[in-house]
Amino acid sequence: MAEQDWIIIGQVVAAQGLKGEVRINPSTDFPERFEVPGQRWLQLPNQDPQSVELERGRQIPGKNLFVVKFEHIQDRTQAENIRGAKVLVRAGDRPELEADEYHVSDLIGLEVFDYNTQAKLGIVSDLYTAAQDVLEVTDANQKKHLVPFVKAIVPVVDLVENRLEVDAPPGLFEI
């Protein structure tokens, strides 16, 4: 399958314990992807995705990490062997979103324009999730700017036109 047929939902960052569990750093706002049993895919560097069965998963309290158990991973050595693997789902398995909700993968790469002047400010290069979502915008000089992803500051997101508009407070792009 082509790369656009997959959505990266996380990455295996470490083994957890001795019985084949792994820690996953998620890149999705849908925790059920790591808590509900079912088919997922693992992709090691320079390899095609391989189907795996998620047996169980749980979030580590107070951390943005999940501990999951895949069916074929039985011990710590096997768990260590998949460290660095991307965890994938098929693009067709994307959850339906409400109005003004977006998939991270749809935001990365959008062109960013000033809401008032329509001047190009840069491109969305990343999204950080914490107390509130923050867009990382990289300008033409490769300088990175952090923009709170809230309606008051980002009033326009147009996925069809591959753009968003920022009504930035003074100085946000001048720092």
UniProtKB/Swiss-Prot annotation:
GO molecular function: ribosome binding
PRC barrel domain ranges (all copies): 99-172
Any one Gene Ontology cellular component term annotated for this protein: ribosome
Top-level taxonomic group: Bacteria
Compartments (UniProt record): Cytoplasm
UniProt family annotation: Belongs to the RimM family.
Protein name: Ribosome maturation factor RimM
Lineage: Bacteria, Bacillati, Cyanobacteriota, Cyanophyceae, Oscillatoriophycideae
Gene, per the UniProt record: rimM
